[in-house]
Amino acid sequence: MERNTCMILALDVTDREEALKIAEDVWEFVDAIKVGYPLILATGLGIIRELAEFAPVIADFKVADIPNTNRLICDQVFEAGADAVIAQGFTGRDSLDACIEIASEYRKDVFVVSEMSHPGGADFMQPVAEAIAKMALEAGAFGLVAPATRPKRVKKIRRIIGDKLTIISPGVGAQGGKASDVIAAGADWVIVGRSIYKAESPKEAARQIAEEIQAELRGEY
């Protein structure tokens, strides 16, 4: 996945036409579109290929099962046209290996959740986040998911993985995270959802956040 705008759109809507219209409006400001269960369950896997006409698609299924089931899920996701899948790390190395094995067959990527962005993400996941990051590094994942709502945690994860893995960081906007803060902490991409797709003008909202990110990268913050 190419790093240009450093922003990923989390497209958590449930209407096909709305999803495609938003993607058409904001594609120039995002490096990828992340879709999850809400949109896929409402419209079917076919929406992945439709959205892929605008930007690479990350399937946020937080895959978390035994290895064989993980293989089946990832195979379906990549066959549908996704460029990457998000998997949980707490299921262990063999389950993660299964996801990475299928991804490699398709020449696609796997992101591993180290810690989620909501307040409850600190309850049980934070104590094991660093171990998950080390496991993802050893397993050869493409990147990690770390919370934009807690930039210090992003910085900690970055110290563990160095420059060997990428970090995508959800929680910017509606959850309280600030794009420039998390980029400064070491994230490669910020993930933004409601602040864009619920805006009166998704295109303008995306443009403003993209400008904030680029200003941080230029050292203007």
UniProtKB/Swiss-Prot annotation:
Gene Ontology MF annotations: orotidine-5'-phosphate decarboxylase activity
Broad EC category: lyase
EC nos: 4.1.1.23
Gene responsible for this protein: pyrF
Pfam families to which the protein is assigned, alphabetical: OMPdecase
Subunit (UniProt): Homodimer.
Record flagged with keyword Manganese: no
Annotated function: Catalyzes the decarboxylation of orotidine 5'-monophosphate (OMP) to uridine 5'-monophosphate (UMP).
UniProt name for this protein: Orotidine 5'-phosphate decarboxylase
Catalytic residue list: K62
Family that this chain belongs to: Belongs to the OMP decarboxylase family. Type 1 subfamily.
GO BP term, example: 'de novo' UMP biosynthetic process
Domain of life: Archaea
